[in-house]
């Protein structure tokens, strides 16, 4: 995510307000149907035996493949970073992600490519596969039209697996966790929460914004400022250590 505020709030264990989530429900239903369809398939391919024996058959598709990506350590234990790959194509060493989206997202992807969040998610899936001893060569994202009558408007995107964005995201999350712990140890949880409140939100769009205790007032959330202590300059300057966006050309 490019939303530092939401990432820090999640790492700090803030309670998130749950609301009726109709669009995510639609996405969940589509994912479950695809899982059922691909798990019924019998596609196989053969791989050579390492000991010189007969080649053996391997199932090509695995839906909802669980992977452990890494962990973020802090004062209150650690966060295990894990997830499920919507579909893994073992023959082509490719992760496949279904995105059920509206026309605006599809137009944006056509114009600008997949968002940072989607690319980092794909990178993390590949890292998780490599942690399991599986190779990952490609990442694919299928943008499926939520509002169309057919899949004619679907947009498949495929690119080479790159572990760097995922490693950057994990390192950034650990840095935020370290700063949260440092502030809490030195000045307490209220100051820690004030620092989280001061972090920038997404410059584009974030589905989690508006669901945390400090932004229940939406665009009027700045009225909540007086419930937090004033941030010392050293903590405000620490915000400058954090990057919202991954810049490939600089790495």
Task: Give, region by region, the residue ranges found by the protein language model.
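Metal-dependent nuclease catalytic regions and adjoining charged, substrate-binding loops involved
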Residues: 128-251
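Intrinsically disordered, low-complexity coil segments
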Residues: 46-57, 71-77, 108-112, 183-200
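Short linear functional motifs in flexible/disordered or boundary regions
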Residues: 15, 42, 46, 99, ...
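Non-catalytic, well-ordered alpha-helical scaffold segments
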Residues: 27-31, 123, 203-204
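Short, charged/polar micro-motifs that form catalytic or ligand-binding hotspots
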Residues: 16, 20, 24, 111-119, ...
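Mg2+/Mn2+-dependent nuclease catalytic core
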Residues: 58, 62-180
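Metal-dependent nuclease catalytic cores that hydrolyze phosphodiester bonds in DNA/RNA
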Residues: 1-94, 248-251
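A residue-level signal for conserved active-site and pocket-lining positions in enzyme catalytic cores
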Residues: 3, 125, 209
